[in-house]
Each structure stands twice: as C-alpha cells, then as structure tokens.
C-alpha cells in the first residue's frame, strides 16, 4: 500500500484557486475518480484554522455517493475558551447553551457534535480526535469519547 501511495498515478490533489488560495475539487467528477482509485479523500469544509467548529445549516457539504465519513475534531481546542478555539462560536454556544467565554470542555464539544451528526443523520460516521499530543490533561480524550457515546479514534497526525 505504501508503495502504491507513492506512485504518481495513485494520488490526486485539488486545483488551487489563484483568487482565493483555496483548493477546490479536480475537474473530474468524483464518481469517475472513485472508479479509478481505491480511496478518494475529500475535505468537506474548513474551520478558519481553528481546532473546533460549529457547522452552518448547509455544512458539511458531503458529496453524493460518499461511502465513509470521518469527522475530525481538533483536541487542541479542548480546555480553551470557546471564543478562541471554535469557528462560529455563537452557533456552538447556541447548540450547547453556554456563553462564548466558557471553556470548550470535552462534554460540550461532544454535545454539539452529537447534535450536528444527528441532524445530518450520520449515525455511521467515525470520529477522530486529532492532536491528542497537545492535551494537558490526557483524560480529556476519554471524557470526549464517553460523552459522545461512540468509539473515538484518538491520534496525532503529523505533517
């Protein structure tokens, strides 16, 4: 598999938009890419470089035909004030009934994530807690998983 990933024909990247500086999907329809490659990874949306996000009503945009969803949560936002760690903090606070200046606890983040996943009917989505190496309190990952009520992949992806 590692050799296949290094092969030029087995990986694609999006097209850089010179006006926005953002990557967009390639010209080929995703269905065609899915027929040509074993895996097609799509970032559904961004979070303005913040570790946590409350999604707007139209997000995330999930392409039709998606087989698996991995919802990534930035652990570096746990234990920080919501107004510093969350993209769209007002929506986040609306969903968990708290103030902007309170701490983004594992329980609050799980409450918001559960509400969003339920609204999108994503009961089979997997959840990855990334950046666990940044946690000052390692029990936060366990608390997040317990509050979420489903298994969580806790990791620190580098690079």
Where are these regions (language model features)?
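Short intrinsically disordered, low-complexity coil segments enriched in acidic
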Residues: 1-5, 39, 46
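N-terminal phosphate/diphosphate-binding loop that engages ATP/GTP or pyrophosphate donors
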Residues: 1-20
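Small-side-chain structural scaffolding
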Residues: 2, 44, 141, 155-156
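Structural recognition of alpha->loop->beta junctions
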Residues: 5-9, 145-154
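Loop/turn-to-beta-strand initiation segments
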Residues: 8-11, 36-40, 68
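General beta-strand structural signal in soluble alpha/beta enzymes
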Residues: 12-15, 40-44, 153-155
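Conserved catalytic-core segment of NTP-binding enzymes
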Residues: 20-36, 45-151
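Long, charged alpha-helical interface segments
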Residues: 131, 158-159
């Amino acid at each position: 598999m590692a050799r296949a990933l290094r092969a030029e024909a087995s990986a694609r990247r999006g097209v850089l938009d010179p006006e926005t500086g953002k990557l967009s999907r390639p010209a080929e329809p995703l269905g065609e890419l899915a027929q040509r490659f074993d895996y097609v990874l799509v970032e559904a949306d961004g979070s303005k470089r913040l570790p946590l996000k409350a999604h707007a009503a139209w997000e995330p945009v999930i392409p039709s035909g998606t087989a698996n969803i991995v919802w990534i949560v930035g652990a570096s936002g746990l234990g920080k004030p919501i107004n510093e760690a969350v993209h769209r903090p007002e929506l986040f606070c609306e969903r968990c009934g708290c103030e902007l200046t309170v701490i983004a606890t594992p329980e609050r983040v799980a409450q918001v994530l559960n509400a969003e996943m339920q609204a999108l009917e994503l009961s089979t989505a997997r959840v990855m807690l990334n950046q666990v190496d940044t946690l000052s309190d390692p029990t936060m990952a366990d608390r997040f998983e317990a509050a979420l009520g489903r298994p969580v992949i806790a990791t620190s992806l580098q690079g």
